[in-house]
From Swiss-Prot:
Gene Ontology terms describing biological process: translation
Family matches, as Pfam families: Ribosomal_L25p, Ribosomal_TL5_C
Function recorded in the entry: This is one of the proteins that binds to the 5S RNA in the ribosome where it forms part of the central protuberance.
GO molecular function: 5S rRNA binding; structural constituent of ribosome
One Gene Ontology term, aspect cellular component: cytosolic large ribosomal subunit
Protein name in the entry: Large ribosomal subunit protein bL25
Keywords assigned: Ribonucleoprotein, Ribosomal protein, RNA-binding, rRNA-binding
UniProt KW Signal keyword: no
The keyword RNA-binding appears for this protein: yes
Binding partners and assembly: Part of the 50S ribosomal subunit; part of the 5S rRNA/L5/L18/L25 subcomplex. Contacts the 5S rRNA. Binds to the 5S rRNA independently of L5 and L18.
């Protein structure tokens, strides 16, 4: 089932126009790409809010219907109110279904509850929560699953260890030397003992006290 969002062409621009739109439960947006001129449009705030409640909308090809004409797009950028978390502006990118696109896809970490090392107190460190990919729009995954259930103490998963769907490429691994760009995504690490942390903290405090005393002596000597 395709996801659809309706819009109207917008002629009014500027802060005043945007305020008037929002008073009427509308928000400004723009659609651009595929060599066509950018187009200012208006969205219904309730409709776009409902659409964004579906996580797949962020990584899906959407049917944008502007003045009853349909275009294939993806969401390229979102702006939200800093306090109310309400969407205030949307950028849509037109796409050609036969040409590859570059966009970010979230990583979903699974198997934490079945990981033996974590049951014994190991710590899960997630270094990356999304990854930039290149693929045809029809091959775009909604998310990439990362299974950590069998990850043992000291082990990690990097870009090359991800289970990437057919037709999808991680863009970082296309830039020359793979090892240089092969980032760690997640790792299982041994928790530091409380005594070790307390000892390190004590050393830091002692060093600070020594520096403070030396500074006081220098002041008195001068």
């Amino acid at each position: 089932m395709s996801l659809t969002i309706n819009a109207l062409t917008r002629d009014d621009q500027g802060k005043g126009a945007s305020h008037r739109l929002r008073r009427n439960h509308k928000i400004p947006a723009i659609v651009y790409g595929t060599g066509k001129a950018p187009r200012n449009i208006t969205l219904d705030v309730f409709e776009i809010t409902r659409l964004l409640e579906n996580e797949e909308s962020y990584t899906s090809v959407l049917d944008l219907i502007v003045d009853k004409k349909k275009e294939a797009v993806i969401i390229k950028d979102l702006q939200r109110h800093p306090a109310k978390n309400i969407v205030t502006h949307v950028d849509f990118l037109r796409i050609n279904l036969k040409q590859a696109i570059v966009t970010s896809v979230p990583l979903h970490f699974n198997g934490e509850e079945n990981n033996e090392a974590m049951r014994l107190g190991a710590i899960l460190n997630q270094f990356v929560t999304s990854v930039e990919v290149s693929c045809l729009p029809t091959d775009l995954p909604h998310a990439i699953d990362v299974d950590i259930s069998n990850l043992t103490m000291g082990e990690h998963i990097s870009f090359t260890g991800l289970n990437i769907p057919k037709g999808v490429v991680i863009t970082a691994l296309t830039h020359g030397d793979i090892e240089t760009h092969n980032r760690s995504v997640v790792a299982i690490q041994e928790p530091r003992k409380i005594a070790e942390i307390e000892e390190e903290t004590s050393i830091i405090v002692e060093d600070e006290n020594i520096e403070s005393n030396n500074a006081d002596k220098n002041k008195s000597n001068s």
